[in-house]
């Protein structure tokens, strides 16, 4: 392992011991904000510190085995050869693990996310599939103990959604769901199809990280056009009695957000503003990424969201993840929320890309 990497790991080990001591300090324990921040830092250091300690121990084992090679006893030398082989293999494995653990973390990965699902080509069938994807993400969120809140929805005439925006809250939400942005294509026989022909429909998914108030970019009120209108869709006697729905247009970017899920105009406006802030931030992030990564491929879909990322073929029970050429014949499980079968390989490929980029930078 490079000396510079060893030095970095030694610094993290030192910091880990420092944080551990601080967490036992009475003045820190009484300051809840500081205690919480240090606890989070300690948890983030845990894996890399454990990996480095295991690496150090493997290095000690290798050195001991080398010393045993000097023994006169042939049996001892043979044992030393075996121990050296095992220690070298362990060091190699741990070095790979530590390289991944040291990759720069996306600061947005721990944030909550807005998931926007929109029916594209395919009419009613696209809206029905948008509803299926909403259910799939809801199941996945449930399995991860995340919370879901519907921010806005426009139901399809025959089920599903023309558009639905959900907020997903919990640990590491954006880090996992960010790979879902892009075009999702479905191939299946609609219930109304009497000839049994397979139809192809499309749905686009956009995943944006939430922008906390403290980090929110400044939005000039003069740049906003705010319209109120009457809610449509489900809602019982309340519907059409008050102009509680909100449409906000950000004039400089042309971004439009509608929220009508809450009965209060104030709540709808607050929700619309949070989605608007996320979309504007995503636009800024995309500009920055384009400048930084103009020559590097990215598994996180580009800003136009038109890239086809996945196909769901119902007659064959097949899911094809086009970005990494992954094909799974586990369609039912995926639609029931078993997304890790796709997301984990995507994350691993993303890490491999990062490692390759890091190697290029280091020359």
Swiss-Prot record:
GO molecular function: translation release factor activity, codon specific
Domain of life of the organism encoding this protein: Bacteria
The keyword Cytoplasm belongs to this UniProt entry's keyword annotation: yes
A Pfam family that the UniProt record links to this protein: RF-1
Cellular compartment(s): Cytoplasm
Modified residues (N5-methylglutamine): 237
UniProt keyword Transmembrane present: no
Gene Ontology CC: cytoplasm
Main location as per UniProt: cytoplasm
Biased composition (Basic and acidic residues): 286-296
InterPro entries to which the protein is assigned, alphabetical: PCRF (IPR005139), Pep_chain_release_fac_I (IPR000352), Pep_chain_release_fac_I_sf (IPR045853), Prokaryotic/Mito_RF (IPR050057), RF-1 (IPR004373)
PTM comment, free text: Methylated by PrmC. Methylation increases the termination efficiency of RF1.
Segments of this protein annotated with the region Disordered: 286-305
Alphabetically ordered keywords of this record: Cytoplasm, Methylation, Protein biosynthesis
Family membership noted in the UniProt record: Belongs to the prokaryotic/mitochondrial release factor family.
Function of the protein: Peptide chain release factor 1 directs the termination of translation in response to the peptide chain termination codons UAG and UAA.
Protein name (record): Peptide chain release factor 1
Natural source organism: Shewanella baltica (strain OS155 / ATCC BAA-1091)
């Amino acid at each position: 392992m490079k000396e510079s990497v060893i030095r970095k790991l030694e610094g993290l080990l030192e910091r880990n011991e420092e944080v551990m001591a601080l967490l036992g300090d009475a003045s820190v324990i009484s300051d809840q904000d500081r205690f919480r921040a240090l606890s989070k830092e300690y948890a983030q250091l845990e894996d890399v510190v454990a990996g480095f300690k295991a690496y150090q121990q493997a290095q000690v084992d290798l050195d001991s085995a080398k010393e045993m090679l000097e023994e006169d006893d042939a049996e001892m030398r043979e044992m030393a050869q075996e121990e050296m082989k095992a220690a070298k293999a362990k060091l190699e494995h741990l070095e790979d693990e530590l390289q991944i653990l040291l990759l720069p973390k996306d600061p947005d990965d721990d944030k909550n996310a807005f998931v926007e699902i929109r029916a594209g080509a395919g009419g009613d069938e696209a809206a029905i599939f948008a509803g299926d994807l909403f259910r799939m993400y809801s199941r996945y969120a449930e399995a991860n103990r995340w919370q879901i809140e519907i921010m806005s929805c426009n139901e399809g005439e025959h089920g599903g959604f023309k558009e639905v925006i959900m907020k997903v809250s919990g640990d590491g939400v954006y880090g996992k769901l960010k790979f879902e942005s892009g075009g999702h294509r479905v191939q299946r026989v609609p219930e109304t199809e009497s000839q049994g022909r397979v139809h192809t429909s499309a749905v686009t998914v956009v995943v944006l990280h939430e922008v906390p108030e403290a980090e929110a970019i400044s939005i000039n009120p003069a740049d906003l056009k705010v319209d109120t209108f009457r809610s449509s869709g489900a809602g019982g006697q309340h519907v059409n009695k008050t102009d509680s729905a909100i449409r906000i247009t950000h004039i400089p970017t042309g971004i439009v957000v509608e929220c009508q899920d809450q009965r209060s105009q104030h709540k709808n406006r607050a929700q619309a503003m949070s989605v608007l802030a996320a979309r504007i931030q995503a636009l800024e992030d995309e500009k920055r990424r384009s400048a930084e990564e103009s020559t590097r491929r990215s598994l996180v879909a580009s800003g136009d969201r038109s890239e086809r990322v996945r196909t769901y073929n119902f007659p064959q029970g097949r899911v094809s993840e086009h970005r990494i050429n992954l094909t799974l014949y586990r369609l039912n499980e995926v639609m029931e929320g078993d997304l890790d079968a796709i997301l984990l390989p995507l994350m691993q490929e993303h890490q491999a890309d990062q490692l390759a980029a890091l190697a290029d930078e280091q020359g």
